[in-house]
Amino acid sequence: MRILLTNDDGVHAEGLAVLERIARTLSDDVWIVAPETDQSGLAHSLTLSEPLRLRKVSDKHFALRGTPTDCVIMGIREVLPEKPDLVLSGVNAGANMADDVTYSGTIAGAIEGTLQGVRSFALSQAFSHGEGRVVPWEVAETYAPDLLRKLMNVDLPDGTFLNLNFPNCAPKDMQGVSVTGQGKLDFGLTVEERQDGRGLPYYWLRFGERLGTFREGTDIHALKHGKISVTPLKLDLTDYTVKDRVAQALGFGVAD
């Protein structure tokens, strides 16, 4: 089995090294094409206004001056000798759940793999920002290999990929696995204004306390209860329950 790895934290990120160790428990044919620099929060963007620069780090290990989407495209279309059997994106430092999935470059790596016709999974490791960015990578590294082996046997429809989030706990305290839906978060988003040396304003986007209802059956609820969350996500964003209402409002009758 040929596996392509990418991430959004960059080619030197600790989570990518963790993902490589996970992947090597599944196959000895593991390739990496990851961003040269941190691309967090760039979602499913791709580079069109400048060239992509590819650097070989070592055998089967490449850095690209581009986004996670660029990396998967280059990996599948240019770098690998043949199409991979699996794309793994991560392991992200921090959970990617609820509304976060639309911002996430980690999720985008799995989205692009899916668009390219390859089974794809995104992996993220939750941690507490109040603990000085101490990420419990051992949780993902301990449980991901067996979980991925099982998930490889799932018959996923075209356009669907899996989003895996690992809880912020010690491996011995992990409480199991839940198959979940997306939750809903209040971002607590603020805009912080500062001034540079010339007195000109600049801004930082900041997130405060992230509140939510943590409804049972959601990714947030699973992680809050020490469980691994596995969420099937699909590329088709159409809200089919609203199509007829929109069509009727426009005088078309029932939508096709």
From Swiss-Prot:
Record-linked InterPro entries: SurE (IPR030048), SurE-like_Pase/nucleotidase (IPR002828), SurE-like_sf (IPR036523)
Report the EC number(s), separated by commas if there are several.
3.1.3.5
* Principal location listed in the UniProt entry: cytoplasm
Question: What compartments host this protein?
Answer: Cytoplasm
Q: Where does a divalent metal cation bind?
A: 8-9, 40, 92
Read off the SUPFAM superfamilies from this record: SurE-like (SSF64167)
Q: Does the keyword Metal-binding apply?
A: yes
Q: How is the cofactor bound?
A: Binds 1 divalent metal cation per subunit.
- Which cofactors? a divalent metal cation
GO cellular component terms, A-Z:
cytoplasm
Single GO MF descriptor: metal ion binding
Its catalytic activity?
Answer: a ribonucleoside 5'-phosphate + H2O = a ribonucleoside + phosphate
UniProt KW keywords: Cytoplasm, Hydrolase, Metal-binding, Nucleotide-binding
Identify its protein family: Belongs to the SurE nucleotidase family.
NCBIfam families for this protein: PRK00346.1-4 (NF001490), surE (TIGR00087)
Per its database record, what is this protein's job? Nucleotidase that shows phosphatase activity on nucleoside 5'-monophosphates.
Q: What is this protein called?
A: 5'-nucleotidase SurE
Query: What species does this protein belong to?
Result: Agrobacterium fabrum (strain C58 / ATCC 33970)
The uppermost taxa in this organism's lineage are:
Bacteria, Pseudomonadati, Pseudomonadota, Alphaproteobacteria, Hyphomicrobiales
